[in-house]
């Protein structure tokens, strides 16, 4: 066990490594089958190896043979459901081009490769034009970056330039964030000049989205036009003031890491000197942010080191808490604490007494994963924000589930999801230490919902009849069933403890039971 003690017991961070046999060096920790449990993924040119996480934290291994990929994810791997079939697709960002592995309805993958030369770096899935379909963005090292607009029919149209358009590239670490709180996704690109020269090629860029699909480069105005050498950045609201701040990690010993505080007016101030981050003198390419000790403040993982957020815009260095590439991050035993997967090992977070909440976002008008949604919670600790993102850090793919630490708070007063479509869902009095799923638009009528995932369903998977456990809490309930596209496929009064699901197509669904102001939901699989 790697034990790292910091301050009071509730702030400790410790990880226990556990071996896992994997194929390939390109990895992800992400739900692949629509059950919202983070799975362990490794890929090669001809194989997708998935360890499907089970509700008890165990795994079931499956290897899926693919056609030999024209491009392997030698530089980065991204994941999302771009065709809305309830299964997660993969993007392979290679040194010569880009390949999509589209998860089909036969439990395999169909290859889609593009002919254009792309020296890929970080890749992301994001709805660039906000039409409800996930597009893809790929940093180009030696030319303007490229993006693939989703046509809504499972195909993409290739574009180059406009976002990350410096002629000789230098585009390394893209991350899509709403830095100006205007409801649309902007793009920050961490840049580098591989020969070490400091010039325009290595000046970080920030592209502001005007909401109409047009992007304007504003890094200099915002105070983020640094020409340090960097491969990635980590964006979070480190002081819980409602504005996203940014840690820019140096990849060169000639530069230091920077923490820039969002002033709330579209500009940033370098506050590095007062934060303690300069205790981190090692450099590298992987930077991301999660609340590793669930104390309600986002921490920074930088090349295996953790900068533990003290809650006052200062950080305490925990050296080499994780492997030096951070790994793919997610909850790999469904206990509410963030774990890491890398190098044939899962590093399980040993946790503490702090509380937590995980939210699964299911888009309807927006993209099905809810990528680009802003999730806000308010508890006694204060207000926290998160965004749903695909592709953070530099190389690996981490969870699409939204994770909050809550310290010792035992209830969340309000939970709000602002979707890319403009729809806003609000839940009140949400219990802690649970995973909830929210379908876009399910609360817009203002219902004061108490959402839990305590429904007992059996058998699950079900073929003909789905039985419910104890329903004595209900007096006059009705039920609705939603598919993974957020469509309501069944609805009726619940007059027995069994629901006939024989007419449903095979796949993943969410059952919602509503009784007055109470709403309970649970996932199930139809076979």
Question: Can you describe what each PLM-predicted range is?
Answer:
Residues 23-34, 74-82, 120-130, 149, ...:
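Beta-propeller blade termini
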Residues 15-19, 315-324, 328-451:
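Gly/Ser/Thr/Pro-enriched helix-cap/hinge segments flanking short amphipathic alpha-helices
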């Amino acid at each position: 066990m790697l034990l790292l003690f910091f301050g009071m017991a509730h702030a400790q961070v410790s990880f226990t490594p556990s071996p896992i046999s994997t194929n390939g060096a390109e990895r992800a920790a992400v739900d692949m089958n629509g059950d919202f449990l983070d799975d362990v993924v490794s890929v090669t040119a001809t194989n997708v190896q998935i360890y499907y996480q089970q509700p008890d934290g165990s795994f079931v291994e499956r290897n899926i043979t693919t056609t030999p990929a024209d491009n392997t994810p030698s530089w980065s791997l991204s994941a999302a459901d771009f065709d809305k079939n309830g299964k997660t697709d993969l993007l392979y960002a290679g040194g010569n081009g880009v390949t999509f592995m589209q998860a089909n309805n036969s439990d395999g993958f169909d290859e889609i490769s593009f002919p254009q030369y792309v020296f890929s770096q970080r890749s992301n899935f994001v709805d660039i034009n906000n039409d409800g379909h996930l597009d893809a963005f790929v940093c180009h090292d030696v030319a303007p970056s490229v993006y693939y607009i989703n046509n809504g029919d499972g195909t993409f149209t290739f574009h180059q330039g406009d976002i990350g358009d410096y002629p000789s590239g230098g585009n390394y670490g893209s991350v899509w964030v709403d830095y100006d709180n205007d409801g649309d996704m902007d793009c920050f690109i961490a840049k580098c000049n591989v020969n070490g020269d400091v010039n325009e090629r290595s000046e970080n860029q920030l592209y502001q989205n005007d909401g109409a699909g047009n992007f304007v480069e504003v890094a200099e105005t915002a105070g983020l036009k640094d020409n340090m050498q960097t491969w990635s950045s980590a964006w979070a609201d480190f002081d819980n003031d409602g504005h996203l701040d940014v840690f820019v990690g140096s990849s060169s010993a000639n530069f230091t890491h920077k923490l820039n505080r969002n002033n709330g007016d579209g500009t940033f101030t370098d506050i590095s000197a007062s934060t303690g981050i300069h205790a981190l003198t090692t450099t590298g390419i992987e930077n991301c942010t999660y609340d590793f000790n669930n104390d309600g403040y986002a921490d920074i993982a930088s090349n295996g080191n953790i900068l533990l957020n003290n809650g006052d815009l200062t950080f305490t260095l925990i050296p080499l808490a994780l492997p030096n590439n951070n790994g793919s991050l997610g909850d790999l035993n469904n206990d509410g604490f963030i774990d890491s997967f890398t190098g044939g090992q899962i590093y399980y977070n040993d946790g503490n007494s702090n509380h937590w909440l995980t939210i699964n976002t299911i888009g309807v008008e927006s993209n099905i994963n809810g990528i680009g949604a802003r999730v806000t919670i308010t508890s006694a600790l204060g207000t926290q924000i998160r965004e749903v993102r695909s592709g953070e850090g530099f190389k690996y793919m981490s969870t699409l589930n939204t994770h909050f630490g809550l310290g010792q708070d035992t209830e969340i007063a309000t939970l709000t999801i602002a979707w890319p479509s403009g729809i806003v869902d609000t839940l009140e009095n949400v219990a802690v230490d649970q995973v909830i799923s929210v379908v876009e638009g399910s609360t817009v009528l203002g219902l004061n919902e108490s959402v839990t995932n305590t429904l007992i369903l059996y058998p699950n998977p079900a073929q003909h009849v789905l039985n419910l456990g104890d329903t004595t809490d209900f007096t006059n309930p009705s039920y609705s069933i939603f598919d993974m596209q957020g469509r309501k496929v069944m609805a009726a009064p619940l007059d027995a403890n069994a629901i006939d699901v024989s007419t449903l197509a095979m796949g993943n669904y969410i059952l919602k039971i509503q009784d007055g102001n109470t709403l309970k939901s649970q996932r199930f699989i139809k076979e």
